[in-house]
Amino acid sequence: MDKLDMLFKKQYDLQVQGMHYDFANMTTEQRAAYVKEYTMHCEHEMHEALQEIPFFKPWKRYDKDAVSEKNQVMWAMARKEFVDALHFFLCVAIGLGFTPDELYAMYCDKNAVNYDRQKDQATYKPSADET
């Protein structure tokens, strides 16, 4: 079992055993509500991660020396919040019905498209199925 499989399994087990979700018997409406709820949680945690990053707020005056002294702590806090978001991201992936292999395959396909886009940005025009 690879690490992505393990992450999915751990999160699935938490959702089923700890949170008592029954994915096999969810109605379409329940599944949609689940995905919506966990997407919002993921967005919230990502916003918290952003707030920990030095110089996040463009309108705020930062003391560069103070930021430098707290730099490692700030990045560590951002990483912690990112891991919180990852839990919710995995919940969304599970709610959407992804398996680790499907997510990996779709990621690789999209990554190839993104590389193609970068090769010639000036002339690239996405097809309808690439968006």
Residue ranges of each PLM-predicted region?
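Flexible "arm" and connector segments at domain edges
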Residues: M1-T131
